[in-house]
Amino acid sequence: MKKENEQLEFKKSTGLLKEAVISACAFANKNGGAIYFGIKDNGEVLGQMVSDDTLKNIANTIKLNTEPRLFPTVEEIEIEGKSCIKVTVEESPLKPHTAYGRPYIRVGTSNQQIDQAAYRHYLESRFNGYGFDLSLIHI
């Protein structure tokens, strides 16, 4: 298995779902990416118990804890003969997104909280992209 990078994140289990929500937010705010459950940070494939409820829970947890809401693709895949979960997050035209009320961006293999100046810039870009003549002073 590859190593983690700017578009690839590994989680050994769904017990790390809160961290995965932050990764999903960071990916959406940058170039997109994929989160794999059942793989250690070093790339060792452990596998993951997978049910329809597990897949729905991951999708719903990401959706309910991001703003604007993210709707990732969540699927069971097999890697090295073991069941894992792949969460695919596309780069979002609605960025910046927040996770648990805070904006994040992917930098290398880590998720970094965006500072206020960068967050303001993202917001202005979003509104300007939709043709609004609106500055942050009006929000």
Language model regions located:
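Conserved N-terminal catalytic/coupling substructures associated with nucleotide/phosphate chemistry
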Residues: 1-137
